[in-house]
């Protein structure tokens, strides 16, 4: 198997990232996302680093995984949580260490930043495979449930 590399996403990745967002939303939540909206939203992150950053995992020059990191300020900790979001691993690359490499990269970068106090993510309550993966990587369920009012997707 070819070597896996992790890099920051750039403007040339927008279409691929957005396409993978749509595939992930359809697979995990049965939601068909609007292509133009996902392209605009993805481009917004690439153009404005204060929103977050994408990491891309490549093998043999092909994108096999990706995730988004966004930021949440914690006044309790006087620090920033990095949130892992929009995780996608190509179906043929699953169970080959792609997510682990992305995760380890995020945690390593987060630990190197003085103002980062932790890494969080949310996972669908029925996605037991992902929950096992996250637990195996040292993550544990938090004390919180997520509540929302979604003005776009309902």
Functional labels for PLM-detected ranges:
Residues 93, 97-105:
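Conserved acetyl-CoA pyrophosphate-binding loop and the N-cap/start of the following alpha-helix
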Residues 9, 87-89, 123:
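Hydrophobic adenine-recognition pocket in adenosine-nucleotide-binding enzymes
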Residues 112, 136, 145-154:
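Terminal substrate-recognition subdomain of acyl/acetyltransferases
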Residues 1-15, 154:
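Conserved N-terminal entry element of GNAT/NAT acetyltransferase domains
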Residues 100, 125-143:
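Conserved active-site alpha-helix within GNAT-family acetyltransferase domains
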Residues 111-122:
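Conserved GNAT acetyl-CoA-binding A-motif
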Residues 84-94:
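A short, internal acetyl-CoA/4′-phosphopantetheine-binding micro-motif in the GNAT/acyltransferase core
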Residues 8-11, 19-80, 85, 103, ...:
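Acetyl-CoA-dependent GNAT
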């Amino acid at each position: 198997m070819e070597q896996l590399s992790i890099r920051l996403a750039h403007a040339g990745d927008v279409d691929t990232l957005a396409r993978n967002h749509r595939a992930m939303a359809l697979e995990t939540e049965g939601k068909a996302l609007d292509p133009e909206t996902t392209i605009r939203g993805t481009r917004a992150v690439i153009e404005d680093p204060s929103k977050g950053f994408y990491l891309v995992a490549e093998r043999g020059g092909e994108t096999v995984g990706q995730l988004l990191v966004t930021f949440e300020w914690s006044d309790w900790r006087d620090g920033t949580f990095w949130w892992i979001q929009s995780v996608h691993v190509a179906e043929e690359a699953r169970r080959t260490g792609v997510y682990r490499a992305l995760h380890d990269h995020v945690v390593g970068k987060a630990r190197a930043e003085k103002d980062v106090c932790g890494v969080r993510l949310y996972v669908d309550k029925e996605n037991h495979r992902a929950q096992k993966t996250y637990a195996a990587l040292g993550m544990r369920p938090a004390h919180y449930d997520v509540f929302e009012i979604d003005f776009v997707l309902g």
